[in-house]
Swiss-Prot record:
SUPFAM superfamilies recorded: Fibronectin type III (SSF49265), Immunoglobulin (SSF48726)
Gene: iHog
GO CC list: axon; cell surface; cytoneme; membrane; plasma membrane
InterPro entries reported for this sequence: FN3_dom, FN3_sf, Ig-like_dom, Ig-like_dom_sf, Ig-like_fold, Ig_sub, Ig_sub2
Name the record gives this protein: Interference hedgehog
PANTHER family given in the database record: BROTHER OF IHOG, ISOFORM G-RELATED, PROTEIN SIDEKICK
Stretches of the chain found on the membrane's Cytoplasmic side: 725-880
Domain Fibronectin type-III residues, every copy: 461-567, 575-670
Residue numbers binding heparin: R497, K501, K503, R541
Taxonomic source organism: Drosophila sechellia (Fruit fly)
Pfam family, one: Ig_2
Free-text note on domains in this protein's UniProt record: The first fibronectin type-III domain mediates a specific interaction with Hh protein, in vitro. The second fibronectin type-III domain is additionally required for in vivo signaling activity.
Residues of the Ig-like C2-type domain: 45-142, 132-232, 252-340, 346-432
Region listing for Disordered, in residue ranges: 426-467, 662-697, 728-762, 775-880
Membrane topology category: Single-pass type I membrane protein
Amino acid sequence: MTLLTSSLLLFSLLTSRLEAIPVLEKSPAHPAHSAHTAHPAHPSPGVRILRAPESLVAPLGDEVVLECETSLQPERFEWSHRSSRSPGAGFKYLRTGTAKANVSQEAAISRLRVLVRPDTLGEYRCVGWFGPLVVTSTTARLELASTSLVDAQESEAPLQWRVSAGNSVLWSCGQQVQSNPSASWSYFRNGVEIKPEFIGTNGNLFLSNVSSESSGIYSCQATNPASGERIQLPGSMQLQVTPEQRSQSKSPHLLKGQPSSQEITIREGSSLLLQCPGVGSPPPTVVWSSPDVVGAVKNKRSKVFGHALEISNTRVHDAGTYICFQDNGVRPALEHYIKVHVEQPPQIVRPPWADLTNEGDRLKLECEATGVPTPEIYWLLNGHSSVDDTEAELSNNFLILHSVLKRHAGYVQCFARNRLGEHSAGTLLQVNPKQIQEPRESGGTHRPKPNQGSKQKQMYPPTPPNVTRLSDESVMLRWMVPRNGGLPIVIFKVQYRMVGKRKNWQTTNDNIPYGKPKWNSELGKSFTASVTDLKPEHTYRFRILAVYSNNDNKESNTSAKFYLQPGAALDPMPVPELLEIEEYSETAVVLHWSLASDADEHLITGYYAYYRPSSSAGEYFKATIEGAHARSFKIAPLETATMYEFKLQSFSAVSASEFSALKQGRTQRPKTSTTEEPTLQMGDRDTTTPSHNETFNMSPMLTGTIGGGAVLILLLISTCLCVCRRRTSRSRGNNPNKPRMAELRDDFVPLGNCSPTKQRQRTRHIHITLNPLAQQQQQALEEKNDTDQDAPYYQRPSSYDYDPTLRRMSSSSLRRSQRTLERAGGSNGSNNGNNNNLNQSAEAGAVENPGKPGRVLMKRPRLSSRSENLSSGSLNSVGV
C-alpha cells in the first residue's frame, strides 16, 4: 500500500504542466557608455516621432509651416505653444482654425501654419495621441529675424595700414554687427565687390600674400539671410602695400585695430578657420601649435595655409587654446592666442527604462545625456510636465515617483536641451492596478449559497488587454491575472466593439480555458488570444470577461482605443531569423534566433513563438517573449522524442512582423539515468489553447519499479511452466506402451533446462548413440517383425560440453558397467527377469547368427536426482 501511494504521488508530480521559460541574454552595453551597466531594451510603445518640427527664424508678418511626422498614424495631432513673452509659463494647447494658427493632418503628418507676430513667437511642440498614450516631439523655436549694429559710430575714421608686400592681413569687419540668424558678408575694394580666398567667421576679411595690387579702400556689408535686410558698415580700411625692398626690417607686430587675442565658438561638425594677424619686414613665417589639443595640427582634418589653419569636421576634443607663433629673424617674435569653444547638441546616452510596476510602488528613472553646454534634463508624463505632478521629484538626472498611480501609466519621456537644440527618449510605463475589495451590501435579504462559507472569496478581474496588430483583419490580445486569493477562473471570453455611437459589445465564440491553477511569475499568469474578422481603418476597444467557478463573471477594464492600421501604411517590423532549435531535454527545446544588423530594436516590444508537431496539421501553440534584446527562449512542456516545427515573429504595440522561415527540431529521447532539469526564470506562456503536451512523462524511478515487477512476473510464469513440464515428463515415463529406447532418452533429459534462474551452468546436452553391432541386430529384428507397431528410432550424434570432471566420472561409470555386464554374461544368460526389448533383441541376434558371439545390451537402473545427469555420459551402448 505504501509503494502504491508513493507511485501515485510521484506520478502526479511528473505529470504536472510546465510553462514556457525564457532564456535571457545579457543585453549589450550602449556604445556611448560602455563603462556603465547596460539596461535591457527599454519597453517601447512601437510609435515614435520620425520628424520633429524644426526651429525657424522668420521676419515679422511672414507665414511659416511647422511639420511633424510619426511612425504610425495617431488618432489625432495637437500642438502646444509657450510664448516668448512669458518664458516661465507652461505650454498651452493651441486652438486650431484661428487666425494665428491652423493645423492640418495628412495620414501620419501634421502641419501647423503660423503667422509670425510678437504673440506667436516662442516654442512649439507636436503631440500625437494613440489612445491614452501620448508622444511629444522635441521643442521648435520660432524667432524673429533681426540685424543691428552694436555701439555704432557714424563718424568713425577709416583704418590706414601700411605693410610690405608678402604679408598677410586680417581685418575684423563684423565685430559691430549682431544678427539672427548669422549674417552673410560681402566685401568691397574701392566700391567693387571682391571674392576673398578665405571666408572667415564673424565678418573677418583675410588677405594673404598681399601685393601692390591689393592696395585700396576696403568696406563690408552684412545681409540677414532670413529677412534679406542689408547693413552697410560705417567703418572701412585703407591698405597701402609697399615693395619689400624699400621697407626697413621690423619684427612681427600687430596693426592698429587688430585683436591681441581671439575667442571663437563653433558648432560640432562645422569647419573651423583660424587666422593669425600680424605683419613684419621681412614677412614672418608662422608655426601653429596647441598645448591643449594633442595632434591638433598634424592630422588628416587639419590644413595649414600660412597665416591660416583650417580644421574640418570639428569635434568636441578640438576645443582648447591654439598659438600662432610668428618669427622673421628680427626679435622679438610674436605669439597670438586663439581660444576655441566647440559646442555640441544634446544627446541622450542612457535612456530611461521602466518595467511593469505595481500601483503604489516607488519608481526611480534615470536619464543621462551629453552635450556642450551641459544640457538641462526635464520629464514629461504622457505629455504633462513632471513639475506639476505631486508624486514626482527631480534629482539631478533622475525622476522619482514616490507612489506610482494609474494616471502615470503611458509614455514617460526624458528631454535634454541646450541652446543648440533638444533630444528625447522615452519608455513605456505599465501600472499593475491594486485589487480593490468590493464592499459588502449592508442590509437586504441576500443569503449566501449553501456551499459558501461566512467569508466569500472575491472575483478578481484580469488586467486590461494589450493589443497588437497581426494583420489587416486580426489583432492579438495579451492580458494577465494578478496574483490573488480569490475565486478560481474557469474560462475567459473576449469582447470587443467598434468605437462610435450605438456600437454594442460583441463576444467571440471561443472559450479560452484558464488552465492549471499555477502562476507563471510573481506578478501573475499571462494569457494571449487573437480576434479576427475586424475591419481595417477602424478604431476598436477590447475587454476580457472572466467566468469563475461559481458560474458568475466579471469583466476587465476596457483597453485603450486601438486603430487598426492597414498593412500598406505601416513600416515593416524586423523579421527574426531562427538559427537553431536546441534539444534541451526530453520535454523542452530552446529556440535561438537573431535580427538583421540594420534592424531597429526600438520598434520591437517582444516576440511571438508558434509551434506544433510536424506530423500535425492543426493550429499552432503560442508563447509570448517579452523584450527586444531576447535571443533565446525555452519552450516546454513538449512530447518526448517528437519532431516539432517552429516559427517566430516580432511585435510592437501596434503591429507584428512577417513570420520567420519554418525550422524543425525535436526533443531528446528518454534517458536511462535520472536527471533533473535546472530551474530557470519563468516566462509568459500561452495557456489559452488546450495543449496536447499535457501527456505525462514516466520518471526513471517509476519505470524501474514497473520493469522490476514485470521481470518478477515473467520469472514466476517460467517457474510454473517448468514445473508443469516436469510433471508432464513424469506422466509420459509411466506409459507402459512407450518404446524403451524413447524412455531411455527421456531418462537423460537434463534437469538444468527447467531452472528458473541464470545462476546454473550452461545446459549440457547428452545424447545416446548405439554401437554398430546393436544397430545391425536391431535392423534384423525389424525386418523380421514387419508388423511391429513400435515407432522407429532416429539416432542423434553425441555432443559434449567439455568438462574434465564429467569426463572422468563418465570413464569410471563405463568401467563399472562393463564389469557388471561381464558378470551377467557369465551366468548362463540369465537376465533376472528383466525381459525387455533389449534382451529380446540380443536373443534374436544369437539365434539368427549362431556362429557369432552374443551381444547383450542392458540399461542400468534409473538414477534419481542430479546423479542421473552426472552419470548419463557413461550410458553408451556396451557390447559383451
